[in-house]
Amino acid sequence: MTSLLTFCAAALMEITGCFAFWAWLRLDKSPLWLIPGMLALALFAYLLTLADSPLAGRAYAAYGGIYIASALLWGWAIEGNRPDQWDVIGAAICLVGMSVILFGPRALPA
């Protein structure tokens, strides 16, 4: 459960950081947006190191499902773009995959 909360916090930081660059380059916002954006991206990277996984690749793969669902929620909450049925179905598939990776039974290391 700790990893799930960590992944949610990491997703918020990654999306916030990336959106700062989007706002600067695509929405003509001030380059000052990059300061909190880069801080958010650094916090995102740190948060991923807190995942309850001995393997970085597995942690990143599991995180991907949370990221996808979070990005769609961001689009709805911040940009006003409500996810359609295909967005929801796609995110649900990703969350199932994330659950298999994160919660699937694992053999104990030898």
UniProtKB/Swiss-Prot annotation:
Signal peptide: none annotated. Belongs to the UPF0060 family. It comes from the Bacteria. The chain crosses the membrane at residues 4-24, 31-51, 59-79, 88-108. Keywords: Cell inner membrane, Cell membrane, Membrane, Transmembrane, Transmembrane helix. This is UPF0060 membrane protein Rpal_4363. It is a multi-pass membrane protein. It is found in: Cell inner membrane. One of its GO terms (cellular component) is plasma membrane. It holds the Pfam family UPF0060.
